[in-house]
Design a protein with these regions (language model features):
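Extracellular/periplasmic carbohydrate-active domains that bind, remodel
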Residues: 1-258
């Protein structure tokens, strides 16, 4: 099922392999299941589209379960107002949630006002470190990603990968330039129970292309809330160390609260 260059679309109750939305506006996808097993089997991609709602969907896919990209696949422009809620994701390969990779380097595109809430992530399995992350924002192609909210997300003991991956990067395999920035991202009521998570990464690119204004509220890992004032944290530790997050260069303002 493909929604292409369309407006005011409602899709409900279908089972398919993939359900991409490109160059479209005002789209609702409700109670749809996307299940794939072949290469490049992304579930529910969004390309250069605005005002898209996924509600009550299920994705088990052989590539990213759901993505938000700017210019890609013949669709042009940024993305605004994309919401996924009340849904379940199972990624046999790559990311459950992935934002930001593709865009038009000449247009400095923006992806903003993205919300993911009340979601269960059942699995994540990716051997390539560059493509790990249950909740992943990788800004490339001069894209700016901002105003993103992850809320009430429950992550089970996935097979292989990272919990969080926020990076401004220049992946020459897929991008023509690094991204411009990632900013104003909230992780609220995120729960992970398991022991397979590898080291998460939060890394900027340079002083002009930063990751900044990142907030974790009630991040709970194996029953322990990770906060700046948590009991048992040595004074010389970064709070991110307690979550097994690597915070690298060109990152500004990360807060962990109860």
């Amino acid at each position: 099922i493909s929604i292409i260059n369309s407006r005011n679309i409602y899709v409900e109750g279908l089972i398919t392999t993939q359900c991409p939305t490109g160059g479209s506006d005002s789209v609702t996808i409700r109670n749809v299941k996307a299940i794939s097993s072949y290469g490049w089997g992304d579930g529910m991609n969004v390309f250069a589209s605005n005002n898209v709602l996924f509600d009550g969907v299920f994705c088990r896919n052989s590539d990213d379960c759901t993505t938000v990209y700017a210019t890609r696949m013949g669709f042009h422009g940024g993305c605004r107002n994309v919401t996924m809620q009340n849904s379940t994701l199972w990624a046999d390969v790559a990311h459950p949630i992935f934002i930001g990779l593709h865009g038009d380097v000449e247009r400095n595109e923006v992806m903003e006002n993205l919300t993911y809430r009340n979601i269960d992530i059942l699995d994540h399995r990716e051997m390539q470190v560059d493509y790990q992350g249950c909740l992943a924002i990788n800004a490339g192609d001069n894209n700016l990603v901002r105003n993103v909210r992850f809320e009430n997300i429950r992550i089970e003991n996935f097979r292989q990968g990272q919990l969080v991956n926020l990076r401004i990067f220049y992946n020459k395999k897929y991008c023509k330039a690094p991204g411009r920035g990632i900013e104003n991202v909230l992780f609220k009521d995120i729960t992970y129970n398991g022991d397979h998570a590898e080291l998460s990464h939060i890394v900027g690119y340079d002083k002009e292309r930063m990751v900044k204004n990142i907030r974790f509220e009630n991040l709970k890992i194996n029953g322990k809330v990770i906060s700046d004032d948590m009991a048992g944290k040595p004074a010389w530790y970064k709070t991110s160390d307690m979550a097994r997050f690597f915070v690298g260069e060109h990152v500004g303002s990360i807060v962990f609260t109860k």
